[in-house]
UniProtKB/Swiss-Prot annotation:
It holds the Pfam family Iso_dh. It comes from Arabidopsis thaliana. The keyword Manganese applies. Residues 1-25 form a transit peptide. NCBIfam families: mito_nad_idh. The gene is IDH1. This is Isocitrate dehydrogenase [NAD] regulatory subunit 1, mitochondrial. The keyword rRNA-binding does not apply. GO terms for molecular function: isocitrate dehydrogenase (NAD+) activity; zinc ion binding.
């Protein structure tokens, strides 16, 4: 048999068992002009923020991603987000930010909350999932926590009634409850998710959380193909640490979502690897998923050992939001390869690598 015939037979055999089939998916057909570079507002923030945002900048440059950053210095001790920063976000529609430290107590409000309220970023989304190669107590965890971002206990409606007595108001409206429920079910529908769980405390807060549940139930009727159930928040936390694989998409009021997302992140590998973002009708802000106020310890900053994985994955979410799916896939795949390989991991993941070493490893894995 000739060498040419032997080669043809080998190729036929490879195609027959599937190993020669290309893995590229059905092509993404962009609209004319979709490849034009997009401006993104960049807020490095406090603590580890500049380290991890710089990691994103390096990877984007290595990928030749069609975005460019407008960088602004914003810090948690500021009383307000500077007007020029808000103007940039409103113009660009998209922002990537590091952690902004929130002072505990005192009269300084959280800039993270200010951004959400002023831009009407009504939905916070945190994706908590197992990364191949990263050992955790539980397997098959893939939870999306969707949290109402603009009202509830975080509305900031507090005052001192008389000396020594402080009143803090929890505000729940039908409009905001329906809006977040619609977003959760729409997300589940568009991402082939099978179940939405509403988290509440309506057994005690019968009017406020009762209104939230009523709104979720009304929206659920419009999505008969998606299973809907409800769970009390304290039982939810217990179930999360016992059997997290039972959850799919979770929709919550503001405070509960913060607690649930951080718990789910801890179960799936830690806040250092969980992506997330905040979205409204017109704007989106992407950040480390489970803790917007996480600025790390001074020692981590001094040693340059901040974990950039969460913000890199959040950047992949941002690229999909900007209609650059192939760049998002390349970035996400490279990050997952580095985690699976296990050679470059920061201290929170059981390694000794620096931020730069992780960045270099991700860049080396880019297709």
């Amino acid at each position: 048999m000739s060498r040419r015939s032997l080669t043809l037979l080998k190729n036929l055999a490879r195609n027959a068992n599937g190993s020669g089939i290309q893995t590229r998916s059905v092509t993404y057909m962009p609209r004319p002009g979709d490849g034009a570079p997009r401006a993104v507002t960049l807020i490095p923030g406090d603590g580890i923020g500049p380290l991890v945002t710089n990691a994103v900048e390096q990877v984007m440059e290595a990928m030749h991603a069609p975005i460019f950053f407008e960088k602004y210095d914003v810090h948690g001790e500021m009383s307000r987000v500077p007007p020029e920063v808000m103007e940039s976000i409103r113009k660009n529609k998209v922002c990537l930010k590091g952690g902004l430290k929130t002072p505990v107590g005192g009269g300084v409000s959280s800039l993270n909350v200010q951004l959400r309220k002023e831009l009407d970023l009504f939905a916070s989304l945190v994706n908590c999932f197992n990364l191949p190669g990263l050992p955790t107590r539980h397997e098959n965890v893939d939870i999306v926590v969707i949290r109402e971002n603009t009202e509830g206990e975080y509305a900031g409606l507090e005052h001192e009634v008389v000396p020594g007595v402080v009143e803090s108001l929890k505000v729940i409206t039908k409009f905001c409850s329906e809006r977040i429920a619609k977003y959760a079910f729409e997300y589940a529908y568009l991402n082939n998710r099978k179940k939405v769980t509403a988290v509440h405390k309506a057994n005690i807060m019968k009017l406020a959380d009762g209104l939230f549940l009523e709104s979720c139930r009304e929206v659920a009727k419009k999505y008969p193909s998606i299973t809907y159930n409800e769970i009390i928040v304290d039982n939810c936390c217990m179930q999360l640490v016992a059997k997290p694989e039972q959850f799919d998409v979770m929709v919550t009021p503001n405070l509960y979502g913060n607690l649930v997302a951080n718990t789910a992140a801890g179960i799936a590998g830690g806040t250092g690897v969980m992506p997330g973002g905040n979205v409204g009708a017109d704007h989106a802000v992407f950040e480390q998923g489970a803790s917007a106020g996480n600025v790390g310890k001074d020692k981590i900053v001094l040693e340059n050992k901040a974990n950039p994985v969460a913000l890199l994955l959040s950047s992949a979410m941002m690229l999909r939001h900007l209609q650059f799916p192939s760049f998002a896939d390349r970035l996400e795949t490279a990050v997952k390869k580095v985690i699976a390989e296990g050679k470059c991991r920061t201290k929170d993941l059981g390694g000794t690598s620096t931020t730069q070493e992780v960045v270099d490893a991700v860049i080396a894995k880019l297709d």
